[in-house]
């Protein structure tokens, strides 16, 4: 199972131009995958931290997290909060990298809102 997981992760990283890591805004340290982040950084591709479930997170903590993780966008899949900001961030990063129609890959632990 672990081999299959990394095979999928490596495939997503290989195919995508921009990658989104979906993280639970209430438990960032527990839901980030530093190995995945390292693989993305080594690939030279853009990683956007997507802080899902922001409607359930402490606002003060969320502001600190957004400053520490860059680029990041706070969203709530439940009520669609932040989706336009996420689209805008993807467009900004795509233009910065010269992609007209970027392939976007989504990574993260299960139950994070992918």
How would you name each of these model-derived features?
Residues 1-43:
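N-terminal accessory targeting/assembly segments
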Residues 23, 51-52:
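Active-site flanking residues adjacent to catalytic metal/cofactor-binding acidic residues
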Residues 45-48, 54-109:
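Canonical P-loop GTPase G-domain recognition
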Residues 112:
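ATP-binding Walker
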């Amino acid at each position: 199972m672990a081999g299959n997981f990394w095979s999928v992760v490596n495939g997503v990283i290989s195919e995508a131009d921009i990658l989104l890591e979906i993280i639970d805004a209430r438990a960032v340290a527990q839901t980030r995958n530093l190995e995945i982040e390292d693989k993305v950084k080594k690939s030279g591709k853009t990683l956007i931290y997507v802080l899902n479930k922001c409607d359930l997170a402490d606002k003060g903590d969320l502001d600190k997290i957004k400053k520490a993780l860059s680029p990041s966008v706070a969203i709530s899949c439940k009520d669609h909060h932040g989706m336009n900001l996420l689209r805008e961030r993807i467009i900004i990063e795509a233009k910065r990298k010269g992609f007209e129609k970027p392939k976007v890959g989504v990574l993260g632990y299960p139950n994070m809102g992918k």
